[in-house]
């Protein structure tokens, strides 16, 4: 039997998702295996910018092109902790390698490097992450709570936040307006 692995995929919330935290969410999946799954929501802003976050934790500034970058609500788990999804991988104290070029870092050194204009070329910062116990995500998928598609990092790093949900759906060849909230089982 093939094992489902959704690392480096998007989970796209179905339109009828009732949990307000995950309504219209696009989750970039960082890890999925026997121990469960984890990812970060890439399209729900936290009413905070990267430069203001750096100031709050005692770090000075960021590159001019990073001023005003939104910080995201990454999910309900460890929502008081920062998670940096970035390219390239680099050499940071605490990183989870997702692909040959993408990592999720939780150590302060990556933010310190950003404040000194030496951090990763492309990044988003989230507060918290979305996590699933073993079998929980598979159950939600069987209940048609999520769509899945291989991730396109241009959606993560290049698209305006408001366009990410529809763009992720279009990766499936579906127009968002044609997507209905529930599906049946034969």
Curated annotation (Swiss-Prot):
Gene3D superfamilies: VC0467-like. InterPro entries: AlgH-like. GO terms for cellular component: cytosol. Pfam families: DUF179. Belongs to the UPF0301 (AlgH) family. This is UPF0301 protein LHK_02881. It comes from Laribacter hongkongensis (strain HLHK9).
């Amino acid at each position: 039997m093939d094992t489902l692995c959704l690392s480096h995929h998007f989970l796209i919330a179905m339109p009828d998702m009732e949990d307000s935290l995950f309504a219209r969410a696009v989750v970039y999946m960082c890890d999925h295996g026997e121990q469960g799954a984890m990812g970060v929501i890439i399209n729900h802003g936290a009413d905070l910018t990267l430069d203001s976050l750096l100031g709050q934790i005692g770090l000075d500034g960021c590159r001019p092109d990073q001023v005003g970058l939104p910080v995201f609500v990454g999910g309900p788990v460890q929502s008081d902790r920062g998670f940096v999804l970035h390219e390239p991988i680099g050499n940071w104290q605490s990183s989870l390698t997702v692909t040959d070029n993408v990592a999720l870092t939780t150590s302060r050194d990556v933010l310190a490097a950003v404040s000194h204009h030496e951090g990763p070329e492309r990044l988003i910062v989230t507060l918290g992450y979305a996590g699933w116990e073993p079998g929980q995500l598979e159950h939600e998928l069987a209940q048609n709570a999520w769509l899945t598609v291989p991730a396109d990092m241009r959606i993560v790093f290049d698209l305006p936040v408001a366009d990410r949900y529809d763009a992720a759906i279009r990766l499936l060849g579906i127009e968002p307006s044609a997507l209905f909230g529930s599906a049946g089982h034969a």
